[in-house]
């Protein structure tokens, strides 16, 4: 997942540098990354957001230097200021998470989509420092029975209708990698945040390694 997501991550972070304000390449939602989630994807007309909804009852901890997180800074000057002043040894100090940072985690691929705090998040990603906790989680698994990516387009399975033709190939590749992960029982190596403070911390991905589970077992 990470090698495929890396070019997309670089594009979304840097596109503001050569675009007008609000003209950056957006990847801050399911619809921007894959296809409009309001489109019907089942024979009976169910829409993508109805069968793959965002849930806020689970939290995962993403490492900005390791886990693929897509930030979309939209203003060149704000991006330049964040990169110049946020980080270890810089004026604002090391990057740290705050309430402005909002990230939706896509499972099973373990990719975070930033929809709040994009400029400072871009600095954390560029510096490879800090952690961010997901705001909500969206599981793509229910979509795999109804949607596929054929290398060019996202298509509905039941009638072959085109849902979108993404500008970049990486979103489609990530979508299909997720299908393979589901078929083979491989989970993303992101750290689950236990809602019970007294509970033992999860070890699903630490600072020094990237844990992969196959059929529930550490590979």
Question: Which stretches of residues belong to each language-model region?
Answer:
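Charged/polar, solvent-exposed surface patches and flexible loops
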Residues: 81, 85, 126, 179
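Long, compositionally biased intrinsically disordered regions
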Residues: 162-219
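Intrinsically disordered, low-complexity segments enriched in small/polar residues
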Residues: 47, 147, 207-208
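Short alpha-helix boundary/capping and kink motifs at helix termini
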Residues: 1-111
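Extended catalytic/binding region for NAD+/ADP-ribose chemistry, centered on the ART fold
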Residues: 111-118
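Charge-dense polyanion-binding interfaces
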Residues: 132-160
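Short active-site loop/helix that positions an aromatic residue
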Residues: 118-131
């Amino acid at each position: 997942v990470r090698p495929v997501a890396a070019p997309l991550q670089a594009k979304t972070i840097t596109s503001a540098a050569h675009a007008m304000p609000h003209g950056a390449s957006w990847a801050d939602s399911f619809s921007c990354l894959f296809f409009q989630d309001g489109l019907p994807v089942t024979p009976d007309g169910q829409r993508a957001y109805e069968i793959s909804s965002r849930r806020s009852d689970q939290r995962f901890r993403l490492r900005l230097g390791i886990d693929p997180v897509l930030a979309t800074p939209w203003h060149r000057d704000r991006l330049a200021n964040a990169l110049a002043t946020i980080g270890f040894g810089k004026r604002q100090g090391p990057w740290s998470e705050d309430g402005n940072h909002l990230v939706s985690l896509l499972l099973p691929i373990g990719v975070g989509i930033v929809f709040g705090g994009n400029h400072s998040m871009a600095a954390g990603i560029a510096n490879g420092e800090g952690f961010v906790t997901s705001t909500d989680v969206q599981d793509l698994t229910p979509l795999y029975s109804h949607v596929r990516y054929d290398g060019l387009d996202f298509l509905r399975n039941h009638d072959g209708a085109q849902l979108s033709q993404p500008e970049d190939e990486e979103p489609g590749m990530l979508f299909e990698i997720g299908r393979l992960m589901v078929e083979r029982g491989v989970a993303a190596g992101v750290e689950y945040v236990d809602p019970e403070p007294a509970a033992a911390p999860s070890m699903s991905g630490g600072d020094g390694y990237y844990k992969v589970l196959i059929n529930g077992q550490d590979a």
